[in-house]
């Protein structure tokens, strides 16, 4: 009864007002799954290709009608009649149809929309919530959230170089408590920024996006907000950064440029010095993309210097790609991977990357993109694989809060079997 009888895609809008693809899959039993595909602003060079129409007279060239057509007139014909429960077989069939390394034929947005909608339809057919369908009986760990409360870089129109300044309420006893702590700190931060005369407009991911005197001032105002909300930095709340340093790197010169620092140009070694100083001064537990995706020597230097003290997360570096992750593991680069479904383009390959990371002792962080929708798949995925951490933006904007609300529902449903590990999610770091 899980046979696919129809697949339909349409063009919808994401949280930035850009088109994206939504897909629906219908089964013989009447079960149904719907999924919408996110889109990134700072993207890795080796990400799977997001197919855009390029017609400047329509949505400024960002339409996805070709990807929609690929679903409705190519993928649908191939998959109708297959069993939705055969996730690996379905994903493999689409990869064979595409036939390219980066999914540039059908488009990763077309393939991912179908892949996720199939999983949702199969879960409904099985009478299971998505997290249990994907993860089985052991899917019960609620993730520690990385909450992006100050936005900079490519996510905001301000002078802050570092793309994301995040809080992690690791001292909470459960996910609901962590969410409450994050929301209270977010509101306290608004008051701190207002008192200093700073703008409290928000960026793509719902964090504040003020012009600040330096990147370090962002950490100072967050520390002040944590205390103002009644919490203790380092015990109750940890800090995390996403530098998105590929955006700051001159490949030819081998130099990073941080416009908001006194010493603007930095070598990879000086960048590590910069991070080490911040880690020694503030309760920073995690730095994502501290080096550019092509600066593997810089990554090795950073991992050797800081990899025992903090979580070093590869995003643009690994692009959720098992082949690239394998190379990084072999070379001892980073100790954590950021997981973004649309970087690789199928649920099967995403699960493969997560499994590979865990076997190597790397932590995993399930992540949204800056262009999001109301789709909450990644919340279910975080619990399904017991990832331990999730990164899905700030404490405002429905496209971000939708994921947090889904995690509240899951925690409620799991009841006494739910786990929340707090500080203990960083199992590969010496305390």
From Swiss-Prot:
The gene is eno. One of its GO terms (biological process) is glycolytic process. Pfam families: Enolase_C, Enolase_N. Its EC number is 4.2.1.11. The active site is at residues 205, 340. Mg(2+) binds at residues 242, 288, 315. Gene3D superfamilies: Enolase-like C-terminal domain, Enolase-like, N-terminal domain. Catalyzes the reversible conversion of 2-phosphoglycerate (2-PG) into phosphoenolpyruvate (PEP). It is essential for the degradation of carbohydrates via glycolysis. It catalyses: (2R)-2-phosphoglycerate = phosphoenolpyruvate + H2O. This is Enolase. Binds a second Mg(2+) ion via substrate during catalysis. InterPro entries: Enolase, Enolase-like_C_sf, Enolase-like_N, Enolase_C, Enolase_CS, Enolase_N. One of its GO terms (cellular component) is cell surface. Belongs to the enolase family. (2R)-2-phosphoglycerate binds at residues 163, 340, 369-370, 391. GO terms for molecular function: magnesium ion binding; phosphopyruvate hydratase activity.
